[in-house]
Amino acid sequence: MLTVDAKGVFPIAPTPFLADGAIDMSSVDRMIDHYVAAGADGCTILGIMGEAPKLDQDEAIGFVARCVARAPKLPFIVGVSAPGFAAMRSLSHAAMAKGAAGVMIAPPPSLRTDDQIVTYYAQAVEAIGSDIPFVIQDYPLTLGVIMTPNVIRRIITDNASSVMLKHED
């Protein structure tokens, strides 16, 4: 399980596709092998760059399973952001059952106030369960949600399962 003691490089993995839109599992294997050979300390999959919204739940779970099976000692963080908490809960539980170390949650673009952002993360933790470690994904240029240092502090203070921040500029 991912903890606050995690450190090192966790590359952001894209999701390779075949011409017909299916996941290119051979390329998944080569990509994960490359990250391991390069000395990655972990790997982040199904984030914004990981084309997660293009996958249905079965495809996402299959991708997680393939990555974890390829490098079972590498901690994988799985993006689980979804339009609703039910889908987030389902993918979080499935990813953890497949061997993920934790999940990553990005705020939806509709959030504007500090209280809305903090409340969203509290609701997300309630939905997925406080036993699942999560990463706060802060990507204001793409999501349009501005998380101030105070908001991030509040999320971390209010949710013990928050173990990492992925800040993107």
Where are each of the predicted segments found?
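A generic local structural motif
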Residues: R30, P149-R154
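Active-site beta->alpha loop and helix N-cap motifs at the rims of alpha/beta catalytic domains
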Residues: L2-I146
